């Protein structure tokens, strides 16, 4: 019987390396692919912790040699620039906080890689994400949280459709991180104790403010800090320097603590308020993607997650007729941030998600 071929996205880290080893052990014909994303991503990190640095490519190639599998470097620089880097700078210019890792997962690591794997004759792609895909008797796929709650990455995968999940494997979803490092040792992989990669691979030293000064100088223009009524309180150094919920570094003398509660890019204004005003009861989200066979049309109770690393909260999801959803939280949520992703769960199953647009106090 002919082996099924799988392309493993190999970053040179321990997770993707063990993914390749596990699938080979399970009988797949494994092909390793490292994605070349940009010159900035390649040069951003000198200690090899960036997923795209030259040393990380070398690590991926070394692991492939040890496993005896072919390894290729594929060029994704054009779509990465257009769909990730440009999006990153444009969102900051709009007074929003982008999530470039989700954009990369969506457009590059899955949509882009799935398209290119056809040229390699592969039936599947696999990554080192800590998540699971299960299939019911009727053929419906469910994207689920990884077993390791501390490492679960289902939040960044809500864009996976039923069609895509038919060709995606997540071998690590049933394991904890410590187990993966032990497996890497058992397989004799040199990356067993390699440090985690940095969050924004194309930003040198993770200094996004310096990066924006160079690539999006319009976000660094000084402007007014006001309260909700428009009363002038001070001057800011550029809206990209501020995040929702921020207290420190405002440079305002006031009788009570003030926090950033909104960013108004149209007027280049940072809006501040009390700690109570940092909380929101509702929001609308757009640019929706659903893991379900069909998008939901009726209101339903969900667990909603408003940022990576934060626990889900009880909420009521009400699909609107214009391709957006309204979300009403059972309890007010702190620092709900436009531009970030909101992901909807039922139990450990991801229903879908979208981008936070408007926030209601």
Where are the regions that the model predicts?
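ATP-dependent adenylation/nucleotidyltransferase module used to activate substrates
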Residues: 1-158, 169, 178, 185
């Amino acid at each position: 019987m002919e082996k099924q071929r799988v392309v493993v996205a190999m970053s040179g880290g321990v997770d993707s390396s063990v993914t390749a080893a596990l699938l080979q052990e399970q009988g797949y014909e494994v092909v390793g692919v490292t994605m070349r994303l940009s010159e900035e991503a390649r040069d951003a990190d000198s200690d090899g912790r960036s997923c795209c640095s030259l040393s990380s490519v070398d690590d991926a190639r070394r692991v492939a040699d040890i496993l005896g599998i072919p390894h290729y470097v594929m060029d994704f620089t054009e779509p990465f620039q257009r769909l990730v880097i440009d999006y990153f700078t444009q969102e900051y210019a709009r007074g929003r906080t982008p999530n470039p890792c989700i954009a990369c997962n969506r457009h590059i690591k899955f949509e882009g890689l799935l398209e290119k794997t056809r040229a390699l004759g592969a039936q599947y792609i696999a990554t080192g994400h800590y998540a699971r895909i299960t299939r019911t008797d009727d053929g419906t796929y469910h994207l689920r949280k990884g077993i390791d709650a501390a490492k679960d990455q289902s939040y960044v995968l809500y864009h996976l459709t039923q069609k895509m999940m038919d060709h995606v494997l997540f071998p690590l979803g049933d394991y904890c991180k410590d187990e993966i490092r032990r497996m890497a040792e058992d397989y004799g992989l040199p990356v067993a104790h390699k440090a985690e990669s940095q969050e924004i691979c194309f930003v040198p030293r993770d200094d996004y403010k310096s990066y924006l000064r160079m690539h999006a100088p319009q976000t660094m223009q000084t402007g007014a800090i006001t309260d909700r009524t428009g009363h002038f309180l001070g001057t800011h150094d550029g809206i990209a320097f501020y995040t929702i919920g921020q207290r420190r570094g405002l440079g305002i003398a006031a009788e009570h603590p003030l926090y950033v509660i909104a960013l108004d890019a149209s007027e280049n204004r940072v809006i501040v308020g009390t700690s109570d005003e940092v909380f929101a009861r509702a929001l609308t989200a757009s640019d929706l993607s659903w893991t379900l066979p069909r998008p939901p049309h009726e209101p339903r109770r969900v667990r909603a997650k408003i940022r990576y690393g934060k626990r889900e909260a009880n909420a009521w999801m009400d699909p609107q007729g214009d391709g957006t959803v309204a979300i009403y939280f059972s309890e007010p949520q702190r620092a709900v941030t436009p531009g970030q992703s909101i992901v909807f769960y039922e139990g450990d199953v991801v229903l879908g998600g979208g981008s936070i647009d408007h926030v209601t106090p």
